[in-house]
Design a protein with these regions (language model features):
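Generic protein-terminus/edge-of-domain signal
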Residues: 1-76, 82-83, 118, 129
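Short histidine-centered beta-strand/loop micro-motifs
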Residues: 40-46, 63, 88-90, 111-113, ...
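Amphipathic, well-ordered alpha-helical segments in soluble domains
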Residues: 51-54, 117, 141-148, 169, ...
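Detector for the N-terminal beta1/A-loop initiation region of ABC nucleotide-binding domains
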Residues: 61, 86, 208
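Aromatic/histidine-rich interaction motifs
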Residues: 115-146
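Short, Lys/Arg-enriched, Trp-marked, Pro/Gly-tolerant hinge/linker segments that flank
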Residues: 131-142, 155-217, 221-222
Length: 223
């Protein structure tokens, strides 16, 4: 697992570039030390891969077009494919550290158009209303997933059969998330989360909204 302190983008885009991501095994594990990022936050971005995460310590806030979610230590969740998001470190008392599995769903689904993809993968990744599936302690079903998720980061890439064991664990977690997301999947979403132009426009709005707000307040104070 690689410690990361920054984010890279494809040229001219806010799509995240994932160093070390290979087609023959489309997966990377990361340990994000958010306090070492510039400004203690990860700016607006997206990626085709899904982002399965667990909070090792501290707490972070996830922002998406749909709103904000706070994740303290011991919580976790999954960010859906192509969802615009940003994160920022919140805790000032302990290190803000996030563990991440970032993978293309083909790792679980196999060949494009497979039965597994159609039945269990596509219903989640094509649902625009599902931006994040949060997992918090205190809910029995979510705690079961969190326990398995935390354990999954203890798998060693040096052990025999690592790739198969990892895929098996991620598949088990995905099935549990699939069941948990049933109420979310039954709701209808309207926006197209895969439209890059819309993402860029939304990033501009989010990044400049605060500037406009401060400017208006400044004007009021001097009029």
């Amino acid at each position: 697992m690689k410690n990361i302190h920054s984010i890279e983008f494809y040229t001219g885009s806010k799509e995240e570039l994932l160093p070390g991501f290979e087609k023959d095994f489309p997966y990377i594990a990361s340990r994000a030390e958010l306090d070492k990022y510039i400004g203690h936050y990860v700016p607006w971005h997206w990626h085709k891969t899904v982002e399965l995460f667990y909070m090792e310590s501290g707490s972070i806030e996830y922002d998406t077009p749909g709103g904000k979610l706070l994740f303290p230590a011991g919580s976790g969740g999954i960010v859906n494919s192509n969802v615009l998001h940003m994160t920022k470190a919140i805790s000032q008392k302990e290190k803000n550290i996030q563990l991440l599995h970032i993978f293309d769903v083909s790792l679980l689904a196999g060949e494009q158009g497979s039965r597994i993809e159609q039945k269990y993968i596509a219903p989640i990744i094509t649902a625009p209303q599902i931006e994040v599936i949060p997992l918090f302690p205190g809910n029995a079903e979510e705690e079961r997933i969190l326990k398995l998720l935390a354990a999954s980061f203890r798998l060693s890439s040096d052990e025999f059969g690592y790739e198969i064991k990892l895929r098996e664990t991620l598949t088990e977690i995905w099935l549990m998330l699939f069941e948990l997301s049933r109420p979310m999947r039954e709701k209808k979403g309207e926006h197209n989360k895969s439209n890059d132009k819309i993402k860029l426009m939304m990033i501009y709005i989010h990044e400049h909204y605060r500037e406009k707000y401060l400017f208006r307040n400044l004007l009021r104070q001097h009029i």
